Regions:
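Non-catalytic positions within long, well-ordered alpha-helices that form the structural scaffold/packing
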Residues: 51-52, 138-141
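Periplasmic-binding protein-like
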Residues: 5-6, 56-62, 102-103, 145-152
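PAS-family sensory/regulatory domains
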Residues: 235-248
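PAS/PAS-like sensory domain cap-loop motif
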Residues: 225-236
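Sensory modules in modular signal-transduction proteins
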Residues: 190-223
Length: 268
């Protein structure tokens, strides 16, 4: 069973609980990690410890949480962003588009023109900085707006001013995010299985095999090569190829210009 965590607001938490109740992903053990209302408040150590403790394989999260977490973790992160599908699913809930503001982060732009044409409406879009959302909502209220479409932070300030709040992430968006994260995990598992099979073949071959990167730094040496060269793994890995092969052989490899070569050397 694969393990996936969703990081986000209480809205995401509600979606995760609904998805778990509906048993939409029976092959996945789902976890929810709260971001405490804002990326600045997220408990990084708690997230890192939970990933290790639960052996979580991938995370689904929004763009602000991604900025904080992605540089610190080694598992795949799938970013969800509001899309046309989310705005379409909101359509029947919005009371008055003329008095409803779409509050967006300047980090990403969404083209709503096709929906405007199909639904015969006009979205009133406003962009904010992370520190300026509170002042923007206050100004929108003063300008006569009665509703806000936005993220959890925008809705928190909108509700304080008695405005209607419409969360622009739908449950379908989170479902798609989980499904995509699951596909990433499966692809990685298949790739790891393939690498394991190739490594097993290389380890059992009677020919010595050495892999290098483009800088001729050794990245892999099979058992036969170690036996031929009379060396240990730690003594050659990440070392220049010149440390174990004569320069004339390396020159021939470089002149060949290909990724493969039939050049062989006999043990001395």
């Amino acid at each position: 069973m694969q393990k996936i965590a969703v990081v986000g607001s209480s809205y995401f938490e509600k979606y995760v609980e609904q998805i778990k109740t509906a048993d939409m992903f029976p092959q996945v053990e789902l976890f929810f990690i709260p971001d405490n209302g804002a990326p600045a408040n997220i408990d990084i150590n708690f997230v890192l410890n939970l990933i290790e403790e639960k052996a979580i394989q991938a995370i689904v999260l929004g763009p602000f949480d991604y900025e904080r977490l992605a540089p610190l973790i080694s598992i795949p992160c799938y970013i969800v962003l509001p899309n046309l599908q989310d705005f379409l699913l909101l359509h029947n809930r919005v009371k008055d588009y003329k008095k409803t503001a779409v509050v967006l982060s300047p980090q990403y732009e969404i083209d709503l023109s096709s929906l405007e044409q199909c639904l015969h409406i006009k979205y009133n879009r406003f962009f904010y900085s992370q520190d300026g959302v509170k002042d923007l909502i206050r100004q929108l209220k003063a300008d006569g707006y009665t509703g806000v479409i936005g993220n959890s932070t925008s809705l928190m300030h909108a509700e304080k001013h008695g405005m209607d709040g419409y969360y622009y992430f739908s449950r379908k968006c989170i479902e798609d995010g989980i499904n995509n994260a699951l596909q990433i995990i499966r692809n990685m598992e298949r790739e790891n299985q393939y690498v394991s099979e190739v490594r097993s073949l290389l380890e059992s071959t009677t020919c010595g095999v050495i892999y290098t990167d483009s800088n001729m730094t050794i990245t892999y040496v099979n058992k036969t090569a170690f036996d031929i060269l009379h060396c240990y793994r730690d003594s050659v890995l990440q070392k220049p190829l010149t440390d174990i092969l004569p320069s004339k052989i390396i020159e021939r490899l470089q002149r060949s210009g290909g990724q493969e070569s039939n050049i062989r050397t006999n043990p001395v």
